[in-house]
Design a protein with these regions (language model features):
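A short acidic, Gly/Pro-enriched loop at the edge of an enzyme's catalytic core
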Residues: 88-100
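Class I SAM-dependent methyltransferase SAM/SAH-binding core
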Residues: 35-89
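C-terminal alpha-helical "lid/dimerization" subdomain adjacent to the S-adenosyl-L-methionine
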Residues: 3, 12-15, 130-184, 188-190
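A short glycine-rich, Lys/Arg-flanked "PGG" loop and its adjoining helix->strand segment in the class I
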Residues: 113-125
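A short SAM/SAH-binding and catalytic strip from SAM-dependent methyltransferases
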Residues: 98-111
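Short glycine-centered segments of the SAM/dcSAM-binding site in methyltransferase folds
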Residues: 55, 126-128
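Core SAM-dependent methyltransferase catalytic element
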Residues: 175-211
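Conserved class I S-adenosyl-L-methionine
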Residues: 1-33, 45-46, 146-153
Length: 211
């Protein structure tokens, strides 16, 4: 099953991308500025939406998914550099990225909080965190159904958790939430957040510049 998962993933996502998810992805990706990091990029479904002139470091831990992403990277108007890397332990320098993007990714990362901590580390102060994610529903009934279905769904869908609480995790690690926009269904959300400013000294220019 795992061997064929990348192919099955693209097959299942094709209709969803055309109906709704594609425009949502575009709206998220087009907000990315400067040097961009994309984590858990999967088969590269975001790549088509990056504007020309953008440079993206795209990471993915599953080399089978990355193999399918290579063709999309070559077709993108942007410069996409693919890196085999775990979002929970990024082999990247601290404080170098202006924007970080994740598209339907946090639900499959074993420790989302570790991944968010890594994003904090590699983003510049006040850098943008841009996400399209499915999360646990705010509806009591739907949320309980997600809780019930998640153990089985994880087995057949590459570890995906239907009841992930991504918004709460983002706030808990210290990002500043700018907006959370629900779509239809309401458990698919666009999240925009900002990295914390690590210190006043880093936020202000040297004092001699004010003289």
């Amino acid at each position: 099953m795992q061997r064929f998962f990348p192919w099955l993933y693209d097959l299942v996502m094709t209709r969803a991308e055309r109906c709704a998810i594609g425009p949502w992805r575009r709206a998220v990706v087009e907000r990315a500025k400067g040097l961009v990091l994309e984590i858990a990029s999967g088969t590269g479904l975001n790549f088509v939406y990056y504007p020309a002139g953008t440079t993206i470091i795209a990471t993915e831990v599953d080399e089978r998914m990355l193999a399918r992403a290579r063709a999309r990277a070559d077709e993108s108007s942007a410069t996409v550099i693919l890196v085999v890397a775990d979002a929970q332990a990024l082999p990247l320098r601290a404080g170098v990225f202006d924007s970080a993007v994740a598209g339907l990714a946090m639900c499959t990362i074993p420790s989302p909080s570790r991944a968010l901590g890594e994003l904090q580390r590699v983003l510049r102060d006040n850098g943008s965190l841009l996400m399209l994610e499915h999360v646990r529903s705010t509806s009591t009934l739907v949320g309980r159904l997600q809780d019930w279905a998640t153990p089985l769904w994880q087995r057949v869908a590459g570890g995906c958790r239907l009841n992930e609480r991504t918004v709460e995790r983002i706030a808990a690690v210290g990002f500043r939430l700018d907006s959370v926009e629900p779509h239809r269904p309401e458990y698919v959300v666009t999240i925009v957040a900002r990295n914390r400013v690590r210190s006043i000294d880093q936020a202000l220019p040297p004092l001699h510049e004010h003289k």
